[in-house]
Amino acid sequence: MARHLPLILLPFVLSCASPARAATTADAEELYRAKRYVEAQTAFEQVIAAEPTNANAAYHLGELAVMRGAPEEAVKWLESAPALVPKSARYFHELGDAYGLSAEKAGLFSKLGLARKCETAYAQAVALDPEDVEARYALFTYYRQAPAIAGGGLEKARAQALEIRKRDEVRGTLALAELSVAEHKFDEAFATLDDLRRRHPESLAASYQFGRAAAMCGQRLDQGAAALRQYLTATPDENQPPLWAAHWRLGQILEKMGDKPGARVEYAAALKLNPTQPQLLEAAQRLK
C-alpha cells in the first residue's frame, strides 16, 4: 500500500511501522560514562518508566540531579535507591550528597534536619563498606565543616582522616593537612605537605592543598603560586579540586603579592568555569 503514497511520505510511514527501541540500562550507563548527560537522563527515565523498581536507574537519576543542582529531585530518586537495595554503600554515599545539597539550599529551619540526614547517610555508607575511602572522605569533610550542633567536630574529622590514611596514605595525609589549615596551624600544614610532596611528587592534590594553604595564610606565596600553576597543567578527576578553585586560589596569591593584573586574569578564568560562585564574583568586583 505504501508504494501508492508520495515518496515524501514514505519515511513517516516507515517510522510509524518501526518505533524506536526503548533504552536499556546498559544503553543509559554507556551514555553516562561518555558524559552525554542529557541523553543519559532521557535513557534512565525510559528505564525507570519500564522498570519502576530499578534501583540503578533511580541512583543515576539522583546523581544527575545532584550534578544539575536540583536537590528535591535528587533526594526523591536517591531515597528510593537504597530503599530498594539497602546494602549499597554507594547509594547511601550519593544520598548523603543529595541531603548536603538540599541543606545548602534550604531555609534556616530546615538546614539542621537535612544536615543530620546527610551525616547519617554518609555514616551508613561507611558502616556498609569500611574500606570505601570516598565515603570516609565525605564523612570526614562533613565533620570538618559542620558545626557541633549538626554533629560536626574536628576530632571526629581527625578520626576519619586517620582511618583514611590506613587505607590510602596520600589521601589520609592530605586530610590531616586540611585539618591543620582548618585549625590555622599553617606551619604544621606546610610541614605535612612538604613531606608528602617530597615522597609523592606525582600527587597533584598535594600541590593544590599547598597552594590553598599559602593563599589562606599569606605565607610561602611564591611556592604556593608555583604549586597551583603545576596543578593547572593537569585535568583533575571528579574527586580532586576543580580547576576554577585553583584559578581562584592563584588569584588570591597574586593579589597578596601585589600583582593585581595577574589576579584579575585568574579570577576571570575561574569565573569562566564557574560563573555563579559568590567568592569569585566578589573577587572580580573588588579588583575592577
Predicted regions and their residues:
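Register position in tetratricopeptide repeats
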Residues: R33-A34, M67-R68, L101-L108, Q145-A146, ...
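Canonical tetratricopeptide repeat
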Residues: H60-E63, E94, A138, A175, ...
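TPR alpha-solenoid repeat register
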Residues: A57, Y91, A135, G172-L174, ...
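N-terminal leader/linker segments that initiate helical-solenoid repeat arrays
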Residues: S18-M67, R90, K288
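Residue-level recognition of tetratricopeptide repeat
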Residues: E29, E63, D97, E104, ...
